[in-house]
Amino acid sequence: MRQWLGMLPPVVFPMVLAAQQRTDTVTLAPVVVTATRLPTRADALPTSVTVISGARLRAEGIRTVAEALRIVPGAAVVTTGPWGGQASLFLRGGESDYVRVLIDGVPQNAPGGSYDFANLTTDNVERIEVVRGPTSVLYGSDAVTGVVQIFTRDGRGAPRAAVAFGGGTYATNAVEVTASGGDDRAGYAIGLSRFASDGIYRFNNDYRNEVLSGHLRLKPDARTDAAMSVRYGDARYHFPTDGSGDPVSNNQHQVDRGPSVGLELGHVFSDDVEGRVTGTWHRDNAQYAIAPNGPSDTTTFPFSSSDWVTRAGLDGRANLRLSGGNVVTVGGAFEHETMQGTTLDGSRSRDDGAAYLQLVTNLERPFSMTLGARLDDNQRFGTYATYRAGLSVRVHGGTRAIASIGTGFKEPNFFENYATGFVRGNPDLQPEHSFTWEAGLEHHIPGTAVTVRATYFNQRFRDLIDYNGSDSVTYNYLNVPGADARGLEIASEAALGGAVHITAAYTFLDTRVTRGGADTGSTALFLTGQPLLRRPWHSATLALSYRLGRRGSMTVTALYTGRRPDVDYRTLRRDTLPSYTRVDLAGQLDLRQPQAGAPGLAVVGKVENLFDAPYQEVTNFPARRRNLFLGGELRFGTP
């Protein structure tokens, strides 16, 4: 408890400081789409939402979405160290496959929810929206503990272009080319980037990641709009480590590549009726290969695999605007999933259809609510129903109370359903599911740009899928374990005098396995009465940004991660990783504004892990030590 209370001052002090110093700058709440699929101010929603702007990403030198998510309350990002190493997100204590990931509305998760954030860069990103809490009522499977949606730039304003470049420690080098432009009728934005590094290990740790992204929007008349987004990524990561963290291989690597396409069409039929249709397609190729270190290596057997996963979906919905500013959304969705390659015996596919209903009352009123229900019909496990309800009440002045309840589910992945050979999949698996409730208070100090919010959440996860290696069972995967996660999130934001911006957050998390799986050994994932792995009990962030007029900014960010349980696969015992604090320093400075016939020039720099803190996010996998990145940007067009 003392440690918990000790973390509160960094979160609370911006509010106290700002209360003594009034500011002339009032920051408007961002408008979010992901929470209700309707443009809504974040401070009017009965759910927990964090928005990270593209401007902040660039000002703080954040290159990957995984790094950006570290500042989100309730989010635990776990990586295996080098650039390109596996990056997982545990949101509010849930599993790493409990978060739906979208890019411009296109699902990026593999069927079954898994997603590796290692190769998801912030290139050409306009903003990131993070919704915490079950959102299956709108997005179906995978949205158990939340949704992360990345929006790319849609191209507004006079035509402009930029070339960014830089390099740093670990032989890191990067280049990005962007171009955008448009008006109210049409707009475009394209980006091409490449990032590479030699890694932190002495051998076989090269990484390179190339991304092409584009967004096109059209508005042929006042009632019709259309948009298309395209993204293609190609990443290759060499790593010497085995599952225990020992660097043993000179010839081990993996490849992740594939396209993503989204199309959306909207039409306003009348003042009261709007229709929207969204089509999505994502195809991902995951490859892995290992070869002996040399002729004398008789213990490493050559192996390679290649799998293609495809998700194609169609979503149609009608927004009906009722009297009093209330909106009813009626929608239906269909998705086709396939997997083929070397992991499964042949090709497998499944379909899912769904119907959903949502009511959003006028969120500008002192008392407002959201209600939603959904019914999914899956080709494999049958029908499954989810619901969500939220309430927002403006209590007094700048104080608002929120509360919500909801359910979510996650379908099994193809391997858990269809594996053959040494591992036997279970075609009769049921989806993992959850029940969640949360309640909180939000206070905006009148006359200032200071907001403080505290939220308590409680989640129950049931029918978790667990591996049983016994030869006596018909299937190796079974719905057995259950777990609970409860916690407290405190977040504050303050803009002081227009030049200083402070954000702070603290999360307390308590997880517990309520029903263990078949494996009762020390390395088991689910042991009755034990906490879930790799989730810290305490975590906090503090970011202080200072604007240098219109010419640039400097930001210092402190990230604290408390003790968390893990497994040491060298000793085959449970372990507790120690707490650590990482401090980053970033800055940008405009040296020259673009002019006719001459580009503008800006310089950027970042020191990650400023004080060279040694730490591990996964046992035996060291994180990056102090590293420096310096770069520049040439800007063409209107400043």
Question: What are the functions of these language-model segments?
Answer:
Residues 27-63, 88, 96-99, 213:
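N-terminal periplasmic "start-of-domain" segments of outer-membrane beta-barrel proteins
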Residues 66, 70-107, 126:
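Extracytoplasmic beta-strand/coil segments of soluble accessory domains associated
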Residues 106-132:
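Short acidic/polar hinge/loop motifs at secondary-structure boundaries
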Residues 169-196, 201-236, 252-274, 322-326:
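Transmembrane beta-barrel wall of Gram-negative outer-membrane proteins
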Residues 178-180, 217-219, 530-639:
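Conserved C-terminal beta-signal and adjacent last beta-strands/turns
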Residues 323-329, 342-459, 545:
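Structural signature of Gram-negative outer-membrane beta-barrels, strongest in the C-terminal barrel
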